[in-house]
């Protein structure tokens, strides 16, 4: 199963784009920091990940999402490649909420 629930802080201004097929894509970058148990010890965890929310009516998020706000994103991980072919994991959010 490919499912991720991630809370974090919005680290860049959200950007809304429309694909050639007319689908809206809201682009976010979320940073998460926490302490996680591993092998009987506490480990500092840090992740910065691109998040994409796709669908209709996403314009309202641009006013709500400000740099530094806390969000919960839930969805699946997908591999993207940049123009040079460098791979990266992107969270394709199916649910997004301010917390």
Regions found by a protein language model. Name each.
Residues 1-99:
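Single-stranded nucleic acid-binding surfaces, predominantly the OB-fold ssDNA-binding core
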